[in-house]
Structure formats: structure tokens, C-alpha cells
Amino acid sequence: MKLSVSNIVWGNEKFDDFLKLLKEEGCDGIELAPSLIWNEPINSSREERQKLKKQINNSGLEFVGFHSLLFSRPDLQLFKDDNSRKKTIEYILNLINLCADLGGKQLIFGSPNNRSLHGRDYEQCLKQSHDDFFEIAEQGLKKNVFFCIEPLGKNYTDFIISMEEGGQMVKKINH
């Protein structure tokens, strides 16, 4: 078993100290909430990405991937309207590229507020998400990054609220 820890527990101050502590405590990797590293992660420069990758690699840890993908972006919504949906998908596609640049292999899609149905029909949203998540999975395949759907309870969101629904989504996309 490999153990990784999120940077959410530490924040962004004294990041090297955090990496050192993780290694000393027997962790193998780190998961990052990208907006805790950069104000706007997808606008990070090649140099900033290389610096972070080197920093993690030099610590002896593996960069596993990203979670809390849309934490700092309440404007990005899958089901609010078509314009927001397109911007959300584009943003996630850019996060796949960023994750790959850092050597990561997974994006964990929780983002409960960003996947709210906003009163829209569940079946319509489900169909649209199949197409959108397939597009994301295709980009992930090109970059060797997995897009993982995190089922969240109904007290957090109203879309993909059980392991069963998450499993059905994965089977439907079949990627």
C-alpha cells in the first residue's frame, strides 16, 4: 500500500517543511489542491511547474495528482448554463495538462458545488455529463492522467451521490 497526503492539511507556507515531514512519516506521495499552490493554476508558467515538480521529486515523494479541482472557481458550473459548462470542461482539460506536466496521474473530481443540478432535469444532466466526461477521459488518455469521479453524499451535492451512481457513470463512459 502507498500512502499520500493532501496539501490541504498544511496549506502553502513552508511547503518544503511539509514535504520533509511527509517523507519522514513514511508517506509515498502528495495530492495537491492546485489553487493552494497558485491563484490560477492553469495560468502557471512552465518555469513554475518545473520548479514545483523538482521540489516534490527532490523530497523523495511522488506527485499523485489533483483534487479540489474547482475549489477556487465557484463561477465554473457543470449544469448552470451551457456557457459555464463549456468553461468548466475547458478548465478541467487544462488541469489535465498541468497534472501531466507535474508527472501526476489522476484528477479527483469532487467539487460538490460545481456539479449542482441547479434545478435542472437529472436525466438531461446525466446524459450531458456522459458526453463531457468522455471528452475529459479522452484528453486524460492522451496525457496518461485518469479522471476519477468522487461520489459525494446528498448533503453535499445532488449529482453522483452514491457509489452506485459513480459506478454507473464509469460503466457508461467505458473509458
Segments predicted by a language model, with ranges:
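Structural motif corresponding to alpha-helix initiation and N-cap regions
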Residues: 12-16, 45-50, 163
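Active-site beta-loop-alpha junctions enriched in small/polar residues
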Residues: 6-10, 33-37, 68-71, 112-114, ...
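Extreme N-terminal starter segment of soluble prokaryotic enzymes
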Residues: 1-4
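Catalytic domains of carbohydrate-active enzymes, especially glycoside hydrolases
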Residues: 16-35, 103
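Active-site acidic/histidine proton-transfer and metal-coordination neighborhood
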Residues: 17, 58, 75-175
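Glycine-rich, aromatic-flanked loop segments that form ligand/cofactor-binding clefts
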Residues: 56-64
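Hydrophobic residues within beta-strands of alpha/beta enzymes
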Residues: 30-31, 64-66, 107, 147
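Glycine-rich, proline-tolerant flexible connector loops at the mouths of alpha/beta enzymes
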Residues: 33-57, 111-117, 121
